[in-house]
Amino acid sequence: MLDILLFSLYFFFEPVLFFFFMVVFGFVALNNYSWLGCFYFFDSFSFILLIVMSLFILGVVLLSESNFMLLLLSEVLVVVCVFFFVPSNVILMYMYFELSMFPILVMILGYGSQIEKINSSYYLIFYAALCSFPFLFVYFKSFFFISLVYFDFNLSWEMVFVLSLSFMMKFPVYFLHLWLPKAHVEAPTTASMLLAGLLLKLGTAGFLRILGCLSFVHNNVWIVLAFLGMILASFCCMFQSDAKALAAYSSITHMSFVLMALVFIIMSGKTGGVILMLAHGYTSTLMFYLVGEFYHVSGSRMVYYMSSFFGSGMIMALLFAVVFLSNMGTPPSLSFLSEFIVISSSLNMMKFSFWVLFVYFFSAFYYSIYLLTSSVMGKGYVNFSIWNVGFSVPLVFMMYNIFWMSVFF
């Protein structure tokens, strides 16, 4: 496997060839997932689906980005993320987990448009360092170095908390989330698409690996954090005037929902959580892409100015409507199916969650419909050409593709 990947470096400076090579690599992974190497192996279909999603996002980035250096950084990030999904031991997983921060950091510092990008980079580094070093401490104090990447040791509650902390920063859960809106607002559109679509999935994928530890301890603290994150972040969405910040807080609500699905340690919750991760990856990538396109054409990200899409470009308007309807979880989108599974499993485990979910969906519908109506009605500020978004249509099909369900059931 390693020699194949070294061969891929030959294509590295030709982004389109590299994309096709990675697609072929993905097909090999799908057909050969029992293929054990020394350091990497494909252990689960959910991780293969995440690899497919990362390649899909790379394809959209290739089509939408013209800056060669940003394309190279995107390729580096996708390779690191693919390696993160298939390691055989914990230290490799940790290494790629931390390595994934650097391409995003270079994108923000090198290609962000405002001076606040320095502040947001400080936030990113500080949160990453503070939450990740405890993971190394637990790693050296326990027997992880002789274990495979799935581990279910009987650890104390404090150790499990410290272990989860680094993944919680990448979810991100509410209270560890401050770096995300700042990074999104300062990052170029490509970095935002990769950050929302790929980087947040590393936290959930890592947390999936350590779910075995949680079966020995009380995980009430994560349930409370997930409930708080769902409600507080969706309230934050209501008060945002910047469309990119709104999309960032919307990511936090969805990832809190995924956390709630995973910490009720039951199979249906885990399945719903993984499908929700995939749905969120496709939806949020497109959300940031559309907001970025609007910003490039109009020079503003204000929700107030995002009016009259339907008057200026019909395809743009329809795509915008489909993406935000999918973000709300309307059927037959992948979001709706996964949310339905998660709701049914969480109500089985905890009856109280009905009230939290009620408030969450009420507020989530509100901010999505508010953005949708404010963009549909009103006086037109911007004229969109029809070609700006022609290549995003496949992503919408992927988002609404119920076929993914057959992999799980």
From Swiss-Prot:
Membrane topology qualifier: Multi-pass membrane protein
GO MF assignments: NADH dehydrogenase (ubiquinone) activity; ubiquinone binding
TM stretches of this protein: 9-29, 44-64, 68-88, 90-110, 125-145, 160-180, 194-214, 221-241, 246-268, 273-295, 305-325, 352-372, 389-409
GO BP annotations, alphabetical order: ATP synthesis coupled electron transport; electron transport coupled proton transport
Subcellular location: Mitochondrion membrane
Keywords: Electron transport, Membrane, Mitochondrion, NAD, Respiratory chain, Translocase, Transmembrane, Transmembrane helix, Transport, Ubiquinone
Name of the protein this chain belongs to: NADH-ubiquinone oxidoreductase chain 4
